[in-house]
Amino acid sequence: MTSIRTSNCASEGRRLTILYMTQTGTSSDLALRISRQAQRKRFHVTIADVCSYDPTDLVSESLMLFLVSTTGQGEFPTTSRPFWNFLLRKGIPEDILEDVTFAAFGLGDSTYPRFCWPVRLLSRRLRGLGAKELVEHGEGDDMHYLGLEGELGPWMNRFWRKLDELCPLEAGVREVGRDELLPPSVTVTKVETEEGRLKEKHDGRDALGRHLEDQGWSISILDKNQRMTATDHFQDVRLLEFVRLNQTDVEEDKRQIGENEEISRGSASALDGISIQTYRPGDILCLHPINDAASVTEMLSRLDLDADTLVSLAGSTIPSTVPQSPAHMSVRDLLTHHLDFTSVPTNSFFEQIRLFSPTGSQEREKLDEYCGIFPEEELAKGANPQDGIDEMYEYAQRPRRTIKEVLDEFKSVQVPLAYIADVLPWIKPREFSIASAPPANSEREKRVSEEPHAIQLSVAMVKYKTRLRKARTGLCTRWLSSLPLGSRVPVVIKPGYLTLPPAQAPLILIGPGTGCAPLRSLVIDRLSNSTLARSEIHLFLGFRYRTKDYLFQHDWQHLQQSYANQFHLHTAFSRDGEAKTYVQDLIVKPDNAHVLWEAITERNAWIVVAGASGKMPEQVRGAFESIARSQGGMDEEQAKRFMDALERQRRWQEECWG
């Protein structure tokens, strides 16, 4: 196993810039994986999130790869929109990027109507500015049985083939072999000083929280963690309530931090509590889960790492939630707060760990096969690399084995500390739609409350059995379940994807299951605000049982009684009777269909669908197409075009999640 310096990996003139647009971190992980492949081909590689990239630098680039995630209804990730808006500016010369060659790969979910639209738009716009497309853009589909890999693998083969033709290696220069170890993308440095150990001991109480404060997060208090579903119901859905720190807590924090310690703060300080002025219906609260102590101890033992060793991290691809040098932390804190070993391993994980298993061992041979690597003699006999990749899918991804379980089974794999942050993925913040409404009766920018304002979430706990019959609990679920009331929890509010309807527009809202959460925020905000409560609201909710999982039941019934002339509640319970009834069945009932059609065509109603992605949004859309046919006299094609027009006007919106 040979280690190669980055400077020795690249040939002069071979430069590739990889820009990624991400919402949850998937495209940034993919950027790292592709950068390693590019380094083996002797490219100088630069990786950047477009939110930190100056778009005026595009004219200086020669070869670029864009990795584009899809959010909302076929939209660019939130942090990528300034970059996209820059490209749309009027007056940009049509040949300004004539010296740029690019390729683009999109990440999306084909159950959405606007599957991978951002990558299509970006590709077209870059060509419109004179850039040359190396290979037709690719579209990775989460719904493929192999996930994104179903399209990524074949597309990357085409990409590298074209790139090799465009930029052939110089005579006598070879690619870096697949069995040679590249330098890590994240530098992990041991901190040996006694001063460092003392500082670690001082900061250890809440180092993560303080760092997140510097990044714009706030510290909240968990005030409620209450089960909403019946104890005998299969799904545990929790009502979580977070409130800002009171003044006593603020003063205590100031005292513990120290009057002379200078601390930089982000846009929302923890000492100010949750900034209630900054959110509106449809917005998102982010939580940062951590690993439990017992699991961390097991992982430390498996990796044979000293928990108390202090390290500092450095690298351009480290997420903002992770402190970099000169800040440092113990290895235990690194595994507790930042590295995820409970997730399902990706192809990239196997590509990494195979290099840390002894060459010639049975485990190394199996790991090679999982990566589609076979000896020449096996290939000559007809071995198919895709068969090995499919076998990896059946071993790891289909039964949802965790990274820890894979490492426990492949005992020969010994990952050194220097590579630990390359092999294990980062813990990603979890996003939840806010279920509570901001203080009403004032404009958003004037919403200020002297009393602590509670932000509420409706969160389904992730607990299931794998195909191997193993009980599995999600990382965030395990963390939330262990939090006692009164815990200090870092949070940050992000803008949602909904375009809020105008005050005079009627609302038609569809929210099965936990999809009712963002709709609750919207409904309460509309009804409790005298300047907004002008038009009718039709709310369609779907649950299994009236007595077991009817979320926010008393709230809906109270609103129905208090606003009987405006608020119209329709509920479907799919398991209460012999015939299963779903929200789409209620929508097409003749009486409802007539009222809804009038609201849409005569009063410009807006429709919002919230909940799980997959078949539900498609079936609900089909129900409205059915109304267009039955009430509007349209044929099938006209009904589809009618719904497409509503979507273009933002009068049809989906707030759905996987």
Curated annotation (Swiss-Prot):
Domain Flavodoxin-like: 16-160
UniProt-listed HAMAP family: NDOR1
Residue positions binding FAD: R400, R430, E431, F432, S433, G474, L475, C476, T477, W657
Name under which the protein is recorded: NADPH-dependent diflavin oxidoreductase 1
Signal peptide: none
Required cofactor names: FAD; FMN
Catalytic activity: 2 oxidized [2Fe-2S]-[protein] + NADPH = 2 reduced [2Fe-2S]-[protein] + NADP(+) + H(+)
Record family assignment: Belongs to the NADPH-dependent diflavin oxidoreductase NDOR1 family. In the N-terminal section; belongs to the flavodoxin family.
Tree of life domain: Eukaryota
Annotated Pfam families: FAD_binding_1, Flavodoxin_1, NAD_binding_1
Cystine residue pairs: none
A Gene Ontology BP annotation from the UniProt entry: iron-sulfur cluster assembly
